[in-house]
């Protein structure tokens, strides 16, 4: 007989720990010790509804730069994203990369997506500091600012189309997935 420690997300770890305490298999202190700081941090951010995700198409995968999930409309222009966000529209800002002058749009966006960059890029660092979901380094994402659209392998997202980003996994989905 072989045994291994189960790999599970924060919610599953808490549920199994509570069950084990209720069944008197472990005490409360041991249950708390089973949770790692990273797992507790997962609980502080929005997550995609795991039951709904199978009904949506993944567009692209990039580098998970800042945790959390967000749904909104795709916007490629910084000024337009700022104005729309100020008017209560949930916006996902999409850029090849970001620079300091783009920060006003960060405040008004629910999430950021870039085709370039890494975990220490401008978009990643600023988004983490603001607690906004962010995915960077989506190298397969082709951004066409002139036609206000982006694409991956023939799948086109026009500005105004709903998308969902999961900054915890680096996945981008077509449509608005419940979080």
What are these regions (language model features)?
Residues 47, 70, 74-80, 88-90, ...:
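Acidic, glycine-rich flexible loop/linker segments
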Residues 1-58, 158-179:
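Terminal amphipathic helices with adjacent charged low-complexity linkers/tails
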Residues 54-81:
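Translation machinery proteins
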Residues 84:
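Short, conserved, surface-exposed binding loops centered on an aromatic residue
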Residues 62, 87-88:
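Glycine-centered secondary-structure boundary/capping sites
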């Amino acid at each position: 007989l072989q045994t291994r420690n189960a790999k599970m997300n924060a919610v599953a770890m808490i549920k199994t720990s509570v069950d084990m305490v209720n069944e008197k298999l472990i005490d409360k202190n041991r249950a708390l010790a089973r949770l790692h700081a990273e797992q507790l941090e997962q609980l502080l951010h929005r997550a995609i509804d795991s039951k709904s995700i199978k009904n949506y198409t993944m567009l692209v995968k990039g580098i998970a730069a800042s945790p959390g999930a967000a749904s909104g409309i795709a916007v490629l222009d910084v000024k337009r994203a700022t104005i729309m966000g100020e008017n209560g529209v949930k916006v996902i800002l999409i850029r090849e990369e970001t620079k300091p002058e783009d920060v006003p749009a960060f405040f008004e966006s629910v999430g950021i997506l870039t085709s370039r960059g890494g975990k220490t890029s401008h978009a990643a660092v600023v988004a983490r500091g603001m607690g906004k979901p962010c995915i960077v380094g989506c190298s397969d994402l082709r951004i066409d600012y002139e036609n206000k659209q982006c694409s991956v392998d023939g799948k086109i997202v026009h500005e105004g189309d709903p998308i969902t980003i999961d900054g915890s996994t680096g996945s981008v989905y077509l449509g608005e997935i419940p979080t």
